[in-house]
């Protein structure tokens, strides 16, 4: 019943009945006059009633509002246009705009029902949004048509003049510029792009005036103050302009005005003078002017391709300065691996400090440092290693390589072996220095050479039991694994340690078995090392030597013992790798001499005739040693550098072991003794093994040839691996992938790659594509 009465009475309340009460409140709100709480609520109620009861009410309210808003704006227009001066006009406009813009948020609120009725919205479904309000749009559109569109160019010009004045150091009320921007941002009637008018006018004018300003100012500043002061100027202006842009330009997320302004400033202040600024880079790097370089870096990083020339300058400097320092110290570092590694580390730390302080460890500059340092490490100018290659019976030489991996291995040996260097260092210091070696090793191209030498040194340390710290020795194996050394190589090193531990158990069992037996030598004095041929990679060459009877008699006992525990395995004796301690007695005193098996065999020749002179020819017959090994062994006994009185004497005198003749006579020095602090010692111990290699000359040649042969096999394997996966591949792509696979071992030379491709084609593993000779196809 109530609903039907309402419908029957619909139309009884008209717009005209309420507008006279509503209008004074609307005018008060427009003029920013105070309104009571009751008037505010009455306005809400009256708008709601008119929209509900008068069918034409919403349209009439909209029209009436439009007229009153227009009238109010005309009054504001008159106040603004009364000023002829542009600055005064701008100030007056901003005063009026501020008041009006505030009311644009307040006046629409009581007219929510009008929004719902005109737009067909359901108030219960969607909250009214003031920014989308019809009343607000009406207010802003009317302001735009009546005032802003007519004077916007004058306002904009005035605003740009104020910004220009601020750049010259003058102060003003920043709200004058901000108000103009707000007008542009809020007075756009395009619903698709509300920032269109702002972008096309205010932003464009701001960017254009900025560019004009610096196109004039920058060149003259550069000419008057020079590049280095100009960089400070440009940096300061870029920061200043960014702060200014954040004040005066629109910063909402969908607008990129600040970014556009900064790009404009970079073009005017930096890009235009890119070549002039970059011309200073090389000199700054040489003079280590890190602060200036950092400033240049921050400027050039804003310019497309601005960093590339700096990277090139850094690379060139590191290579030239690094090699110059190495050449200057060549006399020392070529003979002293410790000094060599220290020199390399000094260079690395110096260049790393430069990159950190000047370029904040930017990845691009770190890459440039690494590339250049790698060139220094692998340079073969100062000292080189030539690896021989036997091919079809002809001795060839590969392209010379840096001796760096060999010297790094030598330095590791000095740290890991019992040496004066390792003795004065703590375990922590040794570990730190080994980690430094591994750092340099990362830059070595031909790591396989390091592996060969490192393994040779490790073999010597384990066999002679001269490791400074067994725990660090084993840690080193894991560190090599961590830095990416090939697994098969690292596994062999680990197996070597395993063999030593197994040998210790075997020795214990052997001694236990023979503790009550009478052997040629007491079991306690014997230390047997049973080594796996695969892990230790010993040469197939066996050097024969006539052993003393005591050793000859011991060998069958060891073999019998081993066969009982390991049936089916055969022992191959490597006397070359053996060593022992013998006692030397004379009238002066008694001395223990640590000797190789070859030295022992030579010295035992005098056991039955201690005072006789024996010729080189007879010693050869007695020991049955090869000529080269006998010469080397004798020289170690007649010219041992640490002894003031040598073990053997000889005549006539010669300059090198090569000068020994069949008739050279050798005799035991009956006055041999150890001298300490200029005093003759009656007892003592001396190691005569020294740096004698536990390999023959031929074995060393084999090892160097082995490096090359292994490279050939690795290259062939890698090519087959790639071809199996790709089936068909271009020459360029094959070479790229090949280097990627082999880079942790060595860098294959183009000549070697070409030769192995031809070998694989010849043996029908791959073939050339008939339509393109630079494409290869895998043959299953």
Curated annotation (Swiss-Prot):
Subcellular location: Nucleus
GO biological process terms, semicolon-separated: ERBB2 signaling pathway; G1/S transition of mitotic cell cycle; intrinsic apoptotic signaling pathway; proteasome-mediated ubiquitin-dependent protein catabolic process; protein K11-linked ubiquitination; protein ubiquitination; reelin-mediated signaling pathway; regulation of neuron migration
Keyword list, A-Z: Host-virus interaction, Isopeptide bond, Nucleus, Phosphoprotein, Receptor, Ubl conjugation, Ubl conjugation pathway
Disulphide bridges, residue numbers: none
Gene Ontology cellular-component annotations: Cul5-RING ubiquitin ligase complex; cytosol; nucleus; SCF ubiquitin ligase complex; site of DNA damage
Effect after changing residue 691 to A: Impaired interaction with ARIH2
Effect annotated for changing residue 55 to A: Strongly impaired interaction with HIV-1 Vif protein
Keyword Transferase: no
Post-translational events: Neddylated; which enhances the ubiquitination activity of ECS complexes and prevents binding of the inhibitor CAND1. Deneddylated via its interaction with the COP9 signalosome (CSN).
Residues in Cullin neddylation domain copies: 711-772
SUPFAM superfamilies xref list: Cullin homology domain (SSF75632), Cullin repeat-like (SSF74788), Winged helix' DNA-binding domain (SSF46785)
MF GO annotations: calcium channel activity; protein-macromolecule adaptor activity; signaling receptor activity; ubiquitin ligase complex scaffold activity; ubiquitin protein ligase binding; ubiquitin-protein transferase activity
Residue numbers carrying Phosphoserine: 34
Pathway this chain belongs to: Protein modification; protein ubiquitination
Glycyl lysine isopeptide (Lys-Gly) (interchain with G-Cter in NEDD8) crosslink residues: 724
Quaternary structure annotation from Swiss-Prot or TrEMBL: Component of multiple cullin-5-RING E3 ubiquitin-protein ligase complexes (ECS complexes, also named CRL5 complexes) formed of CUL5, Elongin BC (ELOB and ELOC), RNF7/RBX2 and a variable SOCS box domain-containing protein as substrate-specific recognition component. CUL5-containing ECS complexes specifically contain RNF7/RBX2, and not RBX1, as catalytic subunit. Component of the ECS(ASB2) complex with the substrate recognition component ASB2. Component of the ECS(ASB6) complex with the substrate recognition component ASB6. (Microbial infection) Interacts (via the substrate recognition component) with HIV-1 Vif; forming an active cullin-5-RING E3 ubiquitin-protein ligase complex (ECS complex).
Similarity section: Belongs to the cullin family.
Protein's name in the database: Cullin-5
Lineage per the UniProt record: Eukaryota, Metazoa, Chordata, Craniata, Vertebrata
Gene: CUL5
């Amino acid at each position: 019943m109530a609903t039907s009465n309402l419908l029957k009475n619909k139309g009884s309340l008209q717009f005209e009945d309420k507008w006279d009460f509503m209008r004074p409140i609307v005018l008060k709100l427009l003029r920013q006059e105070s309104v009571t709480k009751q008037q505010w609520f009455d306005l809400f109620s009256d708008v709601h009633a008119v929209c509900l009861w008068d069918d034409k009410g919403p349209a009439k309210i909209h029209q009436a509002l439009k007229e009153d808003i227009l009238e109010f704006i005309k009054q504001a227009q008159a106040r603004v246009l009364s000023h002829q001066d542009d600055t005064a006009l701008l100030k007056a406009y901003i005063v009026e705009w501020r008041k009006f813009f505030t009311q644009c948020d307040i006046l629409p609120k009581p007219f929510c029902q009008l929004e719902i009725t005109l737009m067909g919205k359901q108030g219960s479904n969607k909250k009214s949004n003031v920014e989308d309000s019809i009343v607000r749009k009406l207010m802003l559109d009317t302001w735009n048509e009546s005032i802003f569109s007519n004077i916007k160019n004058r306002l904009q010009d005035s605003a740009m003049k104020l910004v220009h004045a601020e750049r010259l150091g003058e102060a003003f009320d920043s709200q004058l510029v901000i108000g103009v921007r707000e007008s542009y941002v809020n007075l756009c009637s395009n619903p698709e792009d509300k920032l269109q008018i702002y972008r096309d006018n205010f932003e464009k004018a701001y960017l254009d005036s900025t560019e004009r300003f610096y196109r004039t100012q920058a060149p003259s500043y550069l000419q008057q103050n020079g590049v280095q002061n100009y960089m400070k100027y440009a940096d300061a202006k870029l920061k200043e302009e960014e702060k200014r842009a954040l004040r005066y330009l629109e910063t909402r997320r969908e607008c990129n005005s600040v970014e556009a302004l900064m790009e404009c400033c970079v073009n005017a202040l930096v890009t235009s003078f890119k070549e002039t600024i970059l011309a200073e880079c090389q000199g700054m790097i040489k003079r280590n002017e890190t602060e200036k370089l950092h400033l240049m870096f921050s400027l050039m990083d804003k310019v497309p391709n601005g960093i590339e020339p700096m990277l090139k300058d850094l690379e060139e400097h590191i290579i030239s300065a690094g090699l110059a320092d190495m050449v200057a110290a060549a006399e020392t570092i070529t003979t002293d691996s410790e000094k060599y590694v220290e020199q390399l580390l000094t260079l690395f730390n110096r260049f790393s400090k430069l990159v950190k302080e000047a370029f904040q460890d930017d990845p691009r500059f770190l890459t440039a440092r690494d590339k250049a340092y790698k060139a220094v490490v692998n340079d073969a100018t100062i000292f080189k290693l030539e690896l021989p290659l036997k091919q079809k019976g002809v001795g060839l030489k590969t392209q010379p390589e840096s001796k760096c991996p060999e010297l790094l291995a030598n330095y590791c040996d000095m740290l890991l072996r019992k040496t004066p260097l390792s003795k004065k260092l703590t375990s922590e210091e040794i570990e730190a220095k080994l980690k430094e070696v591994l750092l340099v090793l990362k830059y070595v191209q031909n790591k396989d050479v390091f592996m060969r030498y490192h393994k040779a040194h490790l073999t010597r340390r384990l066999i002679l039991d001269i490791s400074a710290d067994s725990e660090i020795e084993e840690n080193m194996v894991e560190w090599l694994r961590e830095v990416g050394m090939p697994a098969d190589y690292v596994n062999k090193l680990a197996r070597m340690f395993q063999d030593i531990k197994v040998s210790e158990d075997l020795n214990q069992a052997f001694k236990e078995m023979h503790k009550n037996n009478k052997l040629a030598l007491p079991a306690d004095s014997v230390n047997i090392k049973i080594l796996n041929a695969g892990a230790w990679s010993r040469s197939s060459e066996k050097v024969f030597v006539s052993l003393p009877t005591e050793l000859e008699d011991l060998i069958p006992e060891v073999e019998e013992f081993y066969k009982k525990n390991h049936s089916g395995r055969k022992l191959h004796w490597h006397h070359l790798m053996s060593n022992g301690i013998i006692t030397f007695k004379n009238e002066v005193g008694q001395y223990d001499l640590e000797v190789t098996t070859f030295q022992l065999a030579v010295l035992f020749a005098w056991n039955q005739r201690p005072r006789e002179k024996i010729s080189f020819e007879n010693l050869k017959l007695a020991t049955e040693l090869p000529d080269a090994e006998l010469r080397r062994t004798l020289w170690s006994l007649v010219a041992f550098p640490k002894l003031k009185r040598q073990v053997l004497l000889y005549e006539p005198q010669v300059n090198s072991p090569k000068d020994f003749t069949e008739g050279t006579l050798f005799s035991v020095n009956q006055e041999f003794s150890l001298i300490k602090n200029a005093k003759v010692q009656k007892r003592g111990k001396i190691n005569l093994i020294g740096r004698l290699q536990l390999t023959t000359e031929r074995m060393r040649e084999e090892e160097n040839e082995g490096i090359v042969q292994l490279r050939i096999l690795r290259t062939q394997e890698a090519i087959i691996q790639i071809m199996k996966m790709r089936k068909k591949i271009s020459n360029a792509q094959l070479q790229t992938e090949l280097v990627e696979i082999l880079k942790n071992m060595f860098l294959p030379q183009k000549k070697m790659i070409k030769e192995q491709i031809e070998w694989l084609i010849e043996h029908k593993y791959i073939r050339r594509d008939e339509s393109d000779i630079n494409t290869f196809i895998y043959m299953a």
